[in-house]
């Protein structure tokens, strides 16, 4: 969620005032795009617990396994430790690790819903 804006202390009192405020953020219809986001929680089949980040059944191993499908790993090193895979990117889309351990696919900005369907199926 965005932080509240402190650009104006005067309340908007009319439709035209609101339109004038919002219009600069608009885009021509030819530039309109849509994108999808999907969040998925993982669970281990044997005990239904969430996966850890480490290990051969962990989240990092899952991300590394997706590299063979054309995803590029995003790696981060903390405090001089070896880099760890924390996300993936491909064609304007990304797979990221969310705070509760779920994975999020953020789709690319596409022209129509049919393109988003193709994106989620590949």
Task: Tell what function each PLM region has.
Residues 1-122:
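Terminal catalytic/cofactor-binding subdomain
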């Amino acid at each position: 969620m965005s932080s509240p804006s402190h650009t104006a202390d005067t309340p908007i009192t009319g439709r035209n005032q609101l339109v004038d405020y919002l219009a600069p953020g608009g885009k021509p219809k030819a530039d309109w795009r849509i994108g999808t986001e999907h969040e998925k929680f993982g669970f281990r089949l044997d005990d239904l617990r969430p996966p850890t980040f480490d290990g051969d059944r962990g989240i990092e191993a899952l991300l590394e396994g997706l590299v063979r499908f054309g995803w590029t790993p995003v790696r981060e090193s903390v405090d001089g430790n070896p880099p760890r895979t924390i996300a993936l990117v491909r064609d304007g889309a990304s797979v990221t690790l969310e705070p509760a351990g779920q994975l999020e696919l953020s789709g690319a900005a596409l022209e129509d819903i049919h393109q988003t369907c193709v994106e989620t199926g590949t």
